[in-house]
Every structure is written in C-alpha cells, then in structure tokens.
C-alpha cells in the first residue's frame, strides 16, 4: 500500500543527439553517466564517492532470427537473410531521441517484513532510443537511489516491434578491479551450492570443485555465477549485483569475461534454447547494483523491494502471516525414517496400486502417532505450525523417473489420518502446513492444483510448502526459466484465490 507521496518532478532535457546524460543520487554520493558510443551502443558507468563501481559498460539485447511472415515452405533468399540479421540487433545503431529526468520520494507499507514503512526515494533518467536501420524504439529507464542503481529495458508497442524472441540479453557490468567475490556456480536448475570466496580471476580455476552433485543441475560456464553476487573491492567498497521485479522473464545469471573483468547478463533458456518470448508493450526485470562502503548497508538496502511491483492481492495483509514451524523431514534425510510407506513397490500407478495389500516398511515417518509427537513438541516450544513430508501416496518411485503422474496431492497413506491429525493439532493451538512435492512434474501439479488447494481448505491447512526436486516436466524446461517463473506466480495467484 503506497502512501505519503512527497515529490514528483519531471524535466524533459534538451539534448544533442548522443550527448552524455548524468544522473545523481538524492544524497549526491552516486553518479551515473549514460551515453551512446560511436557504434550507437547504449553505455553507462557508475561512481560512488569518487570511486569507480562500474566502468563504461554496454547495454542491449540480441533477438532470435525469425520471419513471422513466412511459412516453412517459402523460398528463402540470401538478401532476406541479411535483412533478418539486422533485425536481431537491439544493441547498437541507436541514437538518443529524448531523455527525461524525474525525482520520486514516498514511504509505503509492505504486507509484512522487517520494517513497518519503507522509503522509496530516487532520481530517474528515462532515455528514449531510436534505431533508424530497423525503425524501432526502446527505452532504458535508470533509477538511482542513495544505495545503488536499477535499470531496465522497455519496449513500446510499435509497428516494427510487436512479438519477438530474446536470444541473449547483453547487459554488462564492467568491474574496476579483480574483486573478492562471494559466489556460487551459475546453474539453470539449482542454487544448492556452498559459497566460494575468491578473486574474480580465480573463479575459472575453482569452478569444477564448486559444482557439487545435486538432484537437478545445469551449470553453463566455467566463469558463470548466480545473482545475488556479493563483492568486496580493495579500496573498501561492497558491491552487489542482482535483479528485481522478475515477472514473465527468465532469471538472470552472470557470465564473467575474466580477462577484462566484465560481467554480462546470462538468461536461463527454455527447452528450445530461447531466452524469452515477448510482446510489446513490455519490459524486462530491473538489473540492480547496490553499493556502499559499509557492508551493513548492503543488507539494509531496500532497492529490491522498491523496484518490485506492488502487491496485487488486495487483502494480503489480512492473511499473509510469518510463522515458525518444525516438520517431519529431517529423519528421512538422515536415513532414520522414510518418505515411502512400503518397500515392496518399485513402481506405483496412482488409482491402481492398492496400498492395503502391501506390507508397511515400519519406518514411514509421516504416520499419525509420530506427527502427534511433533505437534506436542511444537506446542510446548513456541512453534506455530508443523510440516509433514511423505504423507501422500506415490513416494515409492517419486524421483529419477521423469514421471508425469507422480502425485495427486489429496490421497494420504493408510497410516496418515488427515482428520485426526487436524483435530489434534487444533486442540493444541497448532496449524498443519501442507507439503506438495511435485517431483518437478509441473504439468501434473497444475492439473491437480484446484483439487489440492481445496483439499487444504477442507482439512484446515492454511499454508503450503511446494517442492520441485528433479528435472522439470515439461521436459527440457529449467527451474529458473521464463516458463517456470510464470508457473510460480500462477501457484501464488491460485493460492490467493
């Protein structure tokens, strides 16, 4: 909920084509310079208290070569291919059409968080760029806060740019030195790596050791790292590279040119290798550079929250509540218990497999008596909820088979009494937290989502932890691609409904 709007000032800058544009943070400590270089490529740099944070870096995108006017049976002539080559270019050949600056200052209240109110104060530069060779326009919007920079690309609706596919995003972040970095390997499917602390120049040599086994992983480069990336410079600056407002777009990783110390955005591809399907008018997420000479200010920064879209769930504050919970899962991870009800089945077909005819393995952790023990512990020790994994049929062959119909999210094992557990938890003042492991079969989860959420409502579950262990189905998609990011938001929207 936004409130206390203090000042909005807009200034249209008279300009000479491709002249430098300077933007200063409200406190004057950060200065960003934008210009179009001699190749017509947009560039920017960033300085904090006289120290270089980002050296001159180019911006832009490369589109996939395609011609929507042709069919697969049309004859393609070489001259047409040359035209298509030029149409993929959204990274140079630009001239500045106009530039506008503005100032914004407000306080707003988050749904929940560490602070009751957050200040959103920045100076903005919006640069409208025109590309004569393709008769196209894009806008790059910069917002400079006291603690860092955010920028994004915006694509107005226009005759020469309607539907397009992103092949690569070429947002660069040129470092001013061989900084110390706190990094994990760039990967399209997992962030479950231990952090490595090293110089940027050492990333390549340490990458092989840093990539440890995981249930689903797709590392992409010997110098690729994930955001948020934290760095420390030799002259006492702390720099964080990340993104905000990630909606209908792929997650951004960073690929390092370790000869020149230049990071470039690296988007997660889809099953076809494409990195984003776009329709104008639209825009990318924000790319963020948080900077301070005090490490504590990086943690205190609210740039990401300020650049995220406002909450669109009108009554969220009335039902979104943080909780402390414990759960039935760690004894399975340590091998003392199991998610599976029986050891007799190597293959399960939901609706056909009859668990009443199988022998229990005696170590199934998600049983009524054991869950009651956890409820008692939660009630005695100040916890709000109990999560139970392995409660529903299908865990005997849930992983590693690329199985589509793996769970139905509503059928409990014979030893898990849903009604009794809810009654007992309520008598102790404890909420039960639902667990929906999808085994990364996202298509199956979306088919069952309405029934699964209604099952929760009918049985007193007010929250859900969803899991996506394994390789994504539809096969070839990745955990951090555009398709999956849209799924995560779809799940949140359905839960709110």
For each predicted feature, which ranges?
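N-terminal accessory beta-strand-rich subdomains and adjacent acidic, glycine-rich linkers
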Residues: 22-315
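Conserved, mostly hydrophobic/aromatic
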Residues: 153, 378, 467
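Active-site-proximal structural scaffolding
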Residues: 146, 166, 281, 319, ...
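Bacterial Sec-dependent N-terminal signal peptides
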Residues: 1-21
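An acidic-aromatic substrate-binding cleft motif
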Residues: 279-373, 381, 385
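Aromatic- and carboxylate-enriched substrate-binding clefts and catalytic-loop regions
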Residues: 389-497
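Structured core elements
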Residues: 152, 287, 327, 387, ...
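Short amphipathic alpha-helical segments and helix-helix/interface helices
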Residues: 170, 228, 375, 422, ...
């Amino acid at each position: 909920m936004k409130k206390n709007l203090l000042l909005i000032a807009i200034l249209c800058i008279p300009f000479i084509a491709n002249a430098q544009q300077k933007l200063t943070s409200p406190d004057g400590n950060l200065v960003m310079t934008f210009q179009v270089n001699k190749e017509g490529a947009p560039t920017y740099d960033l300085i904090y208290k006289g120290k270089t944070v980002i050296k001159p870096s180019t911006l832009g995108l490369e589109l996939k070569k395609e011609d929507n006017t042709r069919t697969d049976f049309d004859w393609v002539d070489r001259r047409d291919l040359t035209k298509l080559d030029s149409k993929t270019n959204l990274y140079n050949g630009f001239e500045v059409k106009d530039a506008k600056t503005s100032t914004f200052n407000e306080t707003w209240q988050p749904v929940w968080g560490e602070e009751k109110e957050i200040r959103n104060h920045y100076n903005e530069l919006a640069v409208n760029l025109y590309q004569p060779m393709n008769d196209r326009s894009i806008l790059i919007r910069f917002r400079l806060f006291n603690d860092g920079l955010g920028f994004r690309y915006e694509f107005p609706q226009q005759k020469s740019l309607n539907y397009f596919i992103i092949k690569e995003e070429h947002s660069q972040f040129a470092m001013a030195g061989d900084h110390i970095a706190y990094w994990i390997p760039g990967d399209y499917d997992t962030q479950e790596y231990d952090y490595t602390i090293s110089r940027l120049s050492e990333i390549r040599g340490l990458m092989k050791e840093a990539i440890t086994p995981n249930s689903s992983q797709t590392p992409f480069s010997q110098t690729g790292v994930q955001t948020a990336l934290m760095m420390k410079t030799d002259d006492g600056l702390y720099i964080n590279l990340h993104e905000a407002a990630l909606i209908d777009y792929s997650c951004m990783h960073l690929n390092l040119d370790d000869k020149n110390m230049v990071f470039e955005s690296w988007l997660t591809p889809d099953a076809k290798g494409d990195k984003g399907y776009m329709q104008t008018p639209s825009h990318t997420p924000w790319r963020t550079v948080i900077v301070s000479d005090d490490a504590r200010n990086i943690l205190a920064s609210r740039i990401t929250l300020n650049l995220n879209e406002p909450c669109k769930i009108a009554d969220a504050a009335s039902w979104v509540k943080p909780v402390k919970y414990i759960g039935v899962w760690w004894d399975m991870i340590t091998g003392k218990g199991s998610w599976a009800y029986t050891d007799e089945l190597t293959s399960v077909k939901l609706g056909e497999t009859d668990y009443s005819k199988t022998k229990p393995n005696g170590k199934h952790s998600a049983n009524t008596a054991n869950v009651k023990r956890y409820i008692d512990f939660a009630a005695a020790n100040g916890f709000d909820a109990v999560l139970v994994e392995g409660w529903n049929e299908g865990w005997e062959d849930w992983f590693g088979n690329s199985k589509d119909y793996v769970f139905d999210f509503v059928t409990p094992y014979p030893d898990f009494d849903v009604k009794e557990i809810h009654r007992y938890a309520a008598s102790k003042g404890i909420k039960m937290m639902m667990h929906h492991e999808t085994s990364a079969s996202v298509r199956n989860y979306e088919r069952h989502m309405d029934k699964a959420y209604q099952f929760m409502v009918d049985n007193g579950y007010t929250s859900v932890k969803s899991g996506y262990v394994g390789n994504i189905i539809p096969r070839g998609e990745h955990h951090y691609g555009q398709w999956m990011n849209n799924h995560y938001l779809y799940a949140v929207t359905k839960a709110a409904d």
